């Protein structure tokens, strides 16, 4: 049996996952992170995108986070997300529409234009679509 570490994935609204995992994979601001049991203690911020957990036995579950923090301690990994959902619960049509609306806002700058807000909405929609695409590649279109 492979070694495992306890993992919690929580958002401001709820705890989405709590259990033993063999590995956690997330997108940090300096690149991808792969956390295995025995990893050195770490605290880092996370970019919007997928967080993958490989559970005991090798099954994998994918979550989308809108950003947050990753804390690693000797016996646990904790993902503290601003917003988090199971990747299978993402609405692809809504993410595409949000991306189009943000792109339109960026191209039609008006007097009340907030570039930072429009860019953040575009980045979040793009991260959701990347998560959906990664899940499709990994699971062949099946939701997990």
From Swiss-Prot:
Pfam families in the cross-refs: ATP-synt_DE (PF00401), ATP-synt_DE_N (PF02823)
Classification via Gene3D superfamilies: ATP synthase delta/epsilon subunit, C-terminal domain, F0F1 ATP synthase delta/epsilon subunit, N-terminal
Subcellular location(s) per record: Cell inner membrane
Organism domain of life: Bacteria
Membrane topology, as annotated: Peripheral membrane protein
GO cellular component, one term: plasma membrane
Alphabetized PANTHER family for the sequence: ATP SYNTHASE DELTA/EPSILON CHAIN, ATP SYNTHASE EPSILON CHAIN, CHLOROPLASTIC
Name of the protein in question: ATP synthase epsilon chain
The species this protein was found in: Ectopseudomonas mendocina (strain ymp)
Gene name for this UniProt entry: atpC
């Amino acid at each position: 049996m492979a070694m495992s570490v306890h993992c919690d994935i929580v958002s401001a609204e709820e705890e989405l996952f709590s259990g033993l995992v063999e590995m956690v994979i997330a997108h940090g601001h300096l690149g991808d992170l792969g956390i295995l049991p025995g990893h050195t203690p770490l605290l880092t911020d996370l970019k919007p995108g997928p967080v993958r957990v490989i559970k005991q036995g090798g099954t994998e579950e994918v979550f989308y986070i809108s950003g947050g923090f990753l804390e690693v301690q000797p016996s646990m990994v904790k993902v503290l997300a601003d917003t988090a959902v199971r990747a299978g619960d993402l609405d692809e049509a809504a993410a595409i529409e949000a991306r189009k609306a943000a792109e339109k806002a960026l191209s039609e700058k008006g007097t009340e234009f907030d570039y930072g807000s429009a860019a953040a909405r575009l980045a979040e929609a793009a991260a959701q679509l990347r998560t959906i695409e990664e899940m499709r590649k990994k699971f062949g279109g099946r939701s997990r």
